[in-house]
Amino acid sequence: MYQIPDMLYNEKMPPRAKKLFVETFTKYHKMNGGDEDIAMHKARKALEEKYVKIDTLQNLGFRAKPPTR
């Protein structure tokens, strides 16, 4: 079950995001129901809505300086 997020996304997910994905997927997936597509869609939406990746540099106010000539 934990391989599904890694197969869906090319990059590895942080543990908290993976946990949210797997919990949502198992909530909507029934073993013999044939609803894998719906469960994947719901899990992906939950990840997009509830998991926020924090960019610490922007939150601290650091910005890249434009190149000088």
Swiss-Prot record:
Q: Under which name does UniProt file this protein?
A: Uncharacterized 8.2 kDa protein in LEF8-FP intergenic region
Organism (species): Autographa californica nuclear polyhedrosis virus (AcMNPV)
The record ties this protein, via InterPro entries, to: ChaB (IPR009317), ChaB_sf (IPR037205)
